[in-house]
Design a protein with these regions (language model features):
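CBM-like, beta-strand-rich accessory domains located in the C-terminal region of large
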Residues: 1-156
């Protein structure tokens, strides 16, 4: 999932494709549209079973050619927080001076962040029962409580 983990824990217990337990409660959700972009904000208590009862808050600001993704984990007890961005199998990721460059055909997206970034093997599951090897960007945000940001810039 393209979301955060706290000490490796997901926001819910995923048992299989359609079996989910310990579902998080939505604490905040908002949408604000503009002439050329939008802002989405949401938070949940899916990590409340962990020490310090961390709350995850995400804000997405989208504008032509740019997406800002801001993650905050409020509370917590020093757990390591990571954010994951799954890449399509056709994408190739390479390190750049201030983050990563992701390419697919003629499209280039620069990922600029204050977090530590690595690339890991992952699975892309486009359909039930279908698993395709791919890569994911893993952003180590720091220890809870923590806030971090990644900016995705689309290059023509």
């Amino acid at each position: 999932h393209n979301t955060v983990t706290v000490d490796g824990a997901d926001q819910a217990e995923f048992w299989s494709a359609f079996r989910v337990g310990r579902r998080p409660k939505i604490l905040e959700r908002s949408y604000r549209g503009g002439d050329v972009g939008f802002e989405l904000t949401g938070s949940h208590d899916g990590f409340s079973h962990l020490a310090g009862r961390p709350v995850h808050r995400r804000r997405i600001d989208a504008a032509p050619g740019r997406v800002d993704l801001r993650d905050e984990v409020l509370g917590g007890a020093g757990q390591i927080v990571e954010s994951r961005l799954l890449l399509h199998p056709d994408c190739e990721a390479t390190r750049s001076a201030d983050g990563f460059c992701v390419r697919s055909g003629p499209v280039r997206v620069d990922a600029v962040t204050d977090a530590q970034i690595s690339v890991e093997d992952a699975w892309w599951c486009p359909d039930i029962g279908t698993k395709i090897r791919t890569k994911q960007l893993v952003l180590t945000l720091g220890r809870a409580p923590v806030a971090s940001r990644v900016t995705l810039r689309v290059q023509p």
